[in-house]
């Protein structure tokens, strides 16, 4: 499970940062990639990665400001250029209006998509659990931006315990159907009468990962709820220390406020994203240093950076 940041800038493209988009790679888990936001130039950024567009099965949009959606029609059109046997349907989750935006863009431009898009639109009345699969649950809450904006909490369901094959062989269980029974939690009895209890050879279930992705927002308690005990919190950091008034006026957060959210939520790691173009290398290091006075495990991410979860 990995995050890769396709665009980490705020507002408009800059030489060193593209606008918002990131992907959650779930290739080992479910052989899918999930995208969060798709700002202008996202498809160009994908060319610099190993990401295959056909693997992107779900797109989650935080809000309808241009720096988060202007790359979507282009990406969807380019995704249509794959070989026919590679075409797969796509699901888009986002605020009310995302379907109209995409369908009108495709219609007006005369584009043809040889795959189906299934839309899931949300407003204040439909927050909470928005998706559940065999292995993941996704929750959403409204944040505090200048327009309706959502934050997402991706929860991996607990993983099954692993079978201690060596220990099983050591007590005389031959590899084959009996192994499968024990792995499935069934107790067995060997030919000599020895009873084998599955619980003695299967480890405890492992807790799944929690990834929280916060869209544009002022500091809000909704972010704390979404980030509760998260393994990774991706939080916007448009502004730096001392810019709290400006951040509030424009519906954004500072690095210090993001650190406070991570601390209050009990998150394990904080990745600062959506950084203003005025912050260059030295400034970003200072942003990290300042935020670390509140929450130690913090990093300002860069375009194309990959983070293993």
Swiss-Prot record:
Transmembrane region(s): none
Keywords (A to Z) from UniProt: Endonuclease, Hydrolase, Metal-binding, Nuclease, tRNA processing, Zinc
Residues annotated as the enzyme's active site: 67 (proton acceptor)
Binding residue positions for Zn(2+) 2: 67-68, 216, 274
Family annotation (InterPro entries): Metallo-B-lactamas, RibonucZ/Hydroxyglut_hydro, RNase_Z/BN
GO molecular-function term, one example from the UniProt record: 3'-tRNA processing endoribonuclease activity
Cited Pfam families: Lactamase_B, Lactamase_B_2
Gene3D superfamilies tied to this protein: Ribonuclease Z/Hydroxyacylglutathione hydrolase-like
Cofactor(s) needed: Zn(2+)
CDD domains assigned to the protein according to its UniProt record, in alphabetical order: RNaseZ_ZiPD-like_MBL-fold
Family: Belongs to the RNase Z family.
HAMAP family: RNase_Z_BN (MF_01818)
Subunit structure: Homodimer.
Function: Zinc phosphodiesterase, which displays some tRNA 3'-processing endonuclease activity. Probably involved in tRNA maturation, by removing a 3'-trailer from precursor tRNA.
Name the UniProt record assigns to this protein: Ribonuclease Z
């Amino acid at each position: 499970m990995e995050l890769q940041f396709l665009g980490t800038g705020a507002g408009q493209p800059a030489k060193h940062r593209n606008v918002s988009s990131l992907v959650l790679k779930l290739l080992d888990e479910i052989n899918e990639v999930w995208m969060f936001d798709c700002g202008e130039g996202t498809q160009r950024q994908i060319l610099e990665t190993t990401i295959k567009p056909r693997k992107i099965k779900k797109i989650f949009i935080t809000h309808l400001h241009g720096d988060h959606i202007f790359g979507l029609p282009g990406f969807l059109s380019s995704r249509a250029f794959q070989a026919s046997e590679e075409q797969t349907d796509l699901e888009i989750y986002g605020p009310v209006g995302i379907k109209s935006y995409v369908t009108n863009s495709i219609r007006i431009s005369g584009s043809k998509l040889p795959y189906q898009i299934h839309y899931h639109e949300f407003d204040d009345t439909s927050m909470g659990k928005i998706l559940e699969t065999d292995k993941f649950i996704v929750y959403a809450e409204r944040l505090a931006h200048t327009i309706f904006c959502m934050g997402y909490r991706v929860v991996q369901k607990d993983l099954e315990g692993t079978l201690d094959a060596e220990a099983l062989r050591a007590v005389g269980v031959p590899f084959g159907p009996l192994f499968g029974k024990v792995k499935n939690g069934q107790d067995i009895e060997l030919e000599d009468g020895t009873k084998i209890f599955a619980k003695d050879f299967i480890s405890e279930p492992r807790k799944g990962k929690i990834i929280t992705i916060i869209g544009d927002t002022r500091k809000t308690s909704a972010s704390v709820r979404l980030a509760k005990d998260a393994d990774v919190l991706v939080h916007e950091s448009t502004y730096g220390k001392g810019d709290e008034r400006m951040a509030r006026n424009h519906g954004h957060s500072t690095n210090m406020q993001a650190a406070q959210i991570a601390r209050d939520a009990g998150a394990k790691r904080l990745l600062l994203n959506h950084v203003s173009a005025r912050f260059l290398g030295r400034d970003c290091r200072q942003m990290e240093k300042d935020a670390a006075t509140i929450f130690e495990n913090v990093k300002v991410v860069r375009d194309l950076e990959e983070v293993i979860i």
